[in-house]
Amino acid sequence: MSDIHFKKHRVFRETEDVIFYDISVDESNAADLVVHTGAAISPPNDAVGAKQFYKHEFQDDYNRVVQGCRTFELVNGNWKYPYHIVHLNRASGALIIPKNTYHRSTSGKDGSIVINQAKRYAGFQASEEFIPISCAEQHWLYKILMNEKPVIHTLGE
């Protein structure tokens, strides 16, 4: 079984040029809208060009693309295969990123919009959960990025 999981949507109804989706995430108690207006990396590389990641200690992410495409890099030392690259579009469903997973996302030149239907745990503080972590300062993270072949997932497979 893969370490990568998705929360799929349900189509209520389709008409010409319109699709009605149920995108409920029962676990969610928060919602964030993340807009990349053009080519973007979040978090951006650090001052020396090293990749940076977010890691939430008190939040699981359920990232769902609503417009465009977004690519996520995920690193979790507790997984059998610790390095994954996941390509998402609107049909993929919500990518579940469990707490304590290092992650970053990239959009192409046209940008993308993601809704994160997050599950926040007691102790969550926005000022502490969104601090970029550079792989230049985390030796084990740098080692995984350099030595592990990423498992690549495309469009919610």
Where do the model's predicted regions map?
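Active-site region of the double-stranded beta-helix
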Residues: 1-90, 107-112, 118-157
